[in-house]
Each structure stands twice: as structure tokens, then as C-alpha cells.
């Protein structure tokens, strides 16, 4: 299905989400799936762009808080519905521990990534946002995942992410663990992934799946050593 078709679905669905029209949303989603769109494509090409649009509209005060809440909660229901229909791959032996920004919109973005990673065969622990850096460090030291993923983070999370990555490098308890970032502020600030020291970067949930599936030599960036450089502010 071409991009124009997905854009049309987004443009039709978004007003119903903002209005909190649950019946209309169910009808539109069912119609889209009935036209042959896979659940994975719906999440990547419809739910994710709407998620990003909601963040932008809310950040620039172009929608009221009540509309943002309506849309975010209804979109989560849609995402929950989609993940039940994902094709499931066999386990690939790789573990992911995933965190995201603390807002509900960021949490929804993290959920999309977690759901698609799990469907692709990764073992996923998704803790959401608001977790202290000490707890993240302890959890990764205990679980020793193949990947620590910090996805769909807000601008205010960037210094904390840098701190977490620097501490992981300094402690050295998980030398083989790669750190991936993406979505959220990392889509709005060129070079931020490199600045915080991430080894992999992805723009969307499905892009994250492909990035983590790629061989290390293909996807890895050279992680910089801990340094006091200041991160520029990002909206």
C-alpha cells in the first residue's frame, strides 16, 4: 500500500481521536484493517505518525489538554488491539531492557517499540519512564541484556540519558551490552544520539526492530568516552 493511502488514514483517524469518538475510531480502524493493512504496518504507518503529531500539536499548544488526553488514550487502545494481531517470530535469543520518557505519550511510543520487538523474537522488559538512573544501572547489571533501549524520550530526558550511558560505560559491568536510542527528542535533534554516546539509533518502532536485528558491525556507532560536553536545548 502506498504512502498516500496511509496518510489518508491518518488524516481521517486523527480528528476522531481528538474528539474522543470511540465508535468512529473503532469503525475507521476496522475498515483500514479490512482493506488488507497488516497490524504491523498500521502501527508503523498510522499509529506512530499520529503519536508524533499529537506530541507536536500539544507541545505547540495547538490542541487542548482534553483533546490530547482523549486521543492518547484512544490511540493506546488501538495499539493494544494491533499487538494482538502481530505475526510472532521464534525467539532470537536476544534480550532488550527498554525505558522511555515519563509522559503518557512517550510511554505509548515505548509500548509500540516493545510490542514490535517482542513480536520479532526479542525477550523484552519494558519499564516505561520515570525510573531513576541508579535503578536502570542496577537492572542492567542484574539482567545483562543485549540491548539497553531508551526510546521516545522527551527533551528534558536528554541530560539524564547521557548520565545513564556515561555511568554504564564507567562501571563496565555490562561491556557487551549495546545502547540504542530513538524516537522522541532523538528525531528532532540531529546528532543527539551520537552526543549521548548511543551505539544504535532508530527513528520509528519498526526501524528499531531492524536496527537491533542488524549485525553489530553494521549498526554500531563508535561510542564516545564520557565527557563534560553540554547538550544543546531541544524543544
Residue ranges and their predicted role:
Residues 100-108:
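Active-site-adjacent loop and "lid" segments of alpha/beta metabolic enzymes
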Residues 96-97:
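Conserved hydrophobic helix-helix packing surfaces used for dimerization/oligomerization
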Residues 184-235:
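Peripheral docking tails and interdomain loops at the edges
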Residues 38, 123, 146, 199:
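Residue-level detector of anion-binding/catalytic polar loops
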Residues 111-125:
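Short helix-loop-beta junction
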Residues 123-133:
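A short glycine-rich beta-strand->turn/loop micro-motif centered on a GG-aromatic cluster
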Residues 118, 131-190:
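Cofactor-cradling patches in redox/metallo enzymes
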Residues 1-90:
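Long amphipathic alpha-helical segments
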Amino acid at each position: 500500500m502506498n504512502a498516500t493511502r496511509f496518510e489518508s488514514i491518518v488524516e481521517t483517524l486523527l480528528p476522531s481521536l481528538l474528539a474522543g469518538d470511540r465508535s468512529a475510531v473503532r469503525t475507521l480502524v476496522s475498515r483500514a484493517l479490512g482493506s488488507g493493512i497488516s497490524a504491523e504496518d498500521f502501527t508503523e504507518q498510522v499509529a506512530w505518525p499520529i503519536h508524533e503529531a499529537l506530541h507536536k500539536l500539544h507541545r505547540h499548544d495547538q490542541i487542548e489538554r482534553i483533546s490530547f488526553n482523549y486521543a492518547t488514550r484512544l490511540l493506546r487502545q488501538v495499539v493494544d488491539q494491533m499487538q494482538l494481531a502481530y505475526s510472532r517470530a521464534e525467539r532470537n535469543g536476544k534480550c532488550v531492557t527498554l525505558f522511555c520518557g515519563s509522559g503518557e505519550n512517550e510511554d505509548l511510543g515505548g509500548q509500540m517499540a516493545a510490542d514490535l520487538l517482542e513480536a520479532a523474537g526479542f525477550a523484552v522488559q519494558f519499564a516505561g519512564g520515570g525510573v531513576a538512573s541508579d535503578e536502570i544501572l542496577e537492572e542492567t547489571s542484574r539482567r545483562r541484556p543485549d540491548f539497553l533501549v531508551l526510546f521516545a524520550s522527551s527533551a528534558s530526558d536528554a541530560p539524564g540519558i547521557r548520565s545513564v550511558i556515561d555511568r554504564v560505560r564507567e562501571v563496565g559491568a555490562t561491556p557487551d551490552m549495546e545502547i540504542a536510542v530513538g524516537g522522541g527528542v532523538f528525531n528532532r535533534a540531529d546528532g543527539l544520539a551520537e552526543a549521548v554516546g548511543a551505539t544504535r539509533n532508530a527513528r520509528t518502532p519498526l526501524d528499531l526492530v531492524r536496527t537491533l536485528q542488524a549485525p553489530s558491525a553494521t549498526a554500531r556507532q563508535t561510542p564516545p568516552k564520557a565527557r563534560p560536553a553540554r547538550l544543546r536545548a531541544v524543544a
